[in-house]
């Protein structure tokens, strides 16, 4: 929370994971990544086996995410709460994107398990801003 406060940016995550450590990467303008490291291991491992929640500044995040569903192999649908939209590409189902009508962000949920990534993105209580 202290790191996010110093950034002065809105950052989303999937909440705490028991025994995990976290890294925050804000090197790219408009993109902030929260990486989950189970048991604090894997900090130098760049393989795609760790959960990552990315927050992208996107003025039209909702419209862009909805429109992405029209791309080849794209799938988009409204979240159960009615305010958000979820998108993923069938070729990369471990990367799921979500956005809300009233927020200038697109949020990416990456998990090594495609089912977990989709479930997390679709759960209105799971992906939250760090406060």
Regions found by a protein language model. Give the residues of each.
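Short, solvent-exposed recognition patches
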Residues: 1-94
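A short, solvent-exposed beta-edge/loop patch
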Residues: 70-131
């Amino acid at each position: 929370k202290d790191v996010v406060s110093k950034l002065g940016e809105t950052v989303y995550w999937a909440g705490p994971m028991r025994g995990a450590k976290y890294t925050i990467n804000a090197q790219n303008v408009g993109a902030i990544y929260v990486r989950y490291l189970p048991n604090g291991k894997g900090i130098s491992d760049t393989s795609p086996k760790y959960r990552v929640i990315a927050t992208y500044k996107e003025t039209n995040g909702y419209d862009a995410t909805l429109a992405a569903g029209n791309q080849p192999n794209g799938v988009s649908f409204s979240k159960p709460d009615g305010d958000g939209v979820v998108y993923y590409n069938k070729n990369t189902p471990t990367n799921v994107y979500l956005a809300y009508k009233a927020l200038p962000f697109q949020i990416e949920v990456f998990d090594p398990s495609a089912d977990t990534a989709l479930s997390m993105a679709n759960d209105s209580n799971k992906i939250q801003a760090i406060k």
